[in-house]
Design a protein with these regions (language model features):
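Acidic/histidine-rich catalytic cores of soluble enzymes
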Residues: 155-252
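Acidic-and-aromatic substrate-binding clefts and catalytic sites of carbohydrate-active enzymes
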Residues: 48-52, 71-81, 100-107, 130-134, ...
């Protein structure tokens, strides 16, 4: 569905009976509940093109929407002091940042230093490059690298983590890469930032992982999809480009069902993302409005 086929607020004002309300799918209703997202965050990759031209101005627009937290995906040449200043000016905090896989070796000490200087809690690796994923041993190698990075990060008073896409949920040599990472990574050194949209698009239930690995998921990426795609291992590499992403709440993912398990999962940070929004500011505004009103 698109932006919602029925305007919820208008419908609830005009509907004459409770029976009419019951006809709406449950995920479309902001039914009263005791739980909510206290601080909605956003991955700044969503507004990356705007950030290139106006770093400070774009962050100000993010704050004006109502966001309280941001996750970085690059600093566009700014120093740690400059980044910290723009966050403070706009009443924002950054709990996390994304750093590339090839930055986890010789460059990692400087990554840690910068991250600590802007008061980050988490350093997240968001992706393992496609060429490396052709190696059947990559997931064991990645787990070893993540554990080492986790040790360094922990010594600096922060936490290391990994962000998934879709390919971690497709069998490799008879095993799921995501399962291998969870088994091989030290739970105290490596946490998971689960991208709830990507895992859902593979037909995998995130709640299953919350139940099996409680407390391992302090951060989640929250984005939506208009329709659930079909995926096969043969088309895995280009799968991401075929997914029709949309603003949170205007797609088909049942957020109430997932968030009902937030406590067991250990979720502390809910981070909005849209990989290819046509109108980035309008996109993150729509997602913010939905999440800020959501109750479960």
């Amino acid at each position: 569905m698109n932006v919602h086929a029925v305007n919820r607020r208008t419908f609830l004002k005009t509907a004459g009976t409770a029976a009419a309300v019951s006809l709406l799918p449950s995920r479309l209703l902001w039914a009263a509940g005791e739980h909510k997202v206290n601080k909605v965050g956003v991955q700044l990759y969503t507004v990356r093109d705007l950030m290139k031209n106006d770093f400070e101005g774009t962050i100000a627009k993010v704050a004006q929407i109502g966001y309280k937290e941001v996750e970085f995906a690059g600093y566009f040449g700014r120093t740690a002091d400059q980044v910290k200043a723009v966050l403070e000016k706009n009443g924002l905090r950054a709990p996390s940042t994304h750093v590339q896989y090839d930055e986890l070796d010789d460059k990692f000490p400087s990554v840690i230093e910068f991250s600590k200087a802007i008061d980050l809690e988490y350093i997240i690796c968001p992706w393992i490059p496609e060429d490396l994923r052709k190696n059947p041993d990559i997931w064991k190698q990645a787990a070893d690298k993540f554990n080492k990075a986790g040790e360094q990060t922990k010594k600096a008073g922060m936490q290391f983590g990994y962000h998934n896409h879709w390919f971690e949920f497709l069998p490799t040599n008879g095993k799921l890469p995501y399962d291998e990472l969870l088994k091989l990574c030290d739970a105290n050194l490596v946490k998971m930032e689960m991208d709830l949209c990507w895992i859902e698009t593979t037909g995998t239930d995130p709640v299953k992982y919350f139940d099996q690995y409680p407390g391992r998921f302090p951060l989640v990426h929250v984005k939506d999809v208009k329709t659930m795609p079909k995926i096969s291992s043969g088309g895995a590499q280009n799968f991401g480009d075929t997914v029709d992403l949309t603003e949170v709440g205007s797609g088909v993912i049942d957020w109430k069902r997932i968030f009902a398990h937030s406590e067991k999962a250990g979720i502390k940070h809910y981070i909005v993302e849209h990989d290819h929004p046509k109108q980035p500011i309008e996109s993150i505004k729509g997602s913010y409005e939905y999440l800020s009103k959501l109750r479960w």
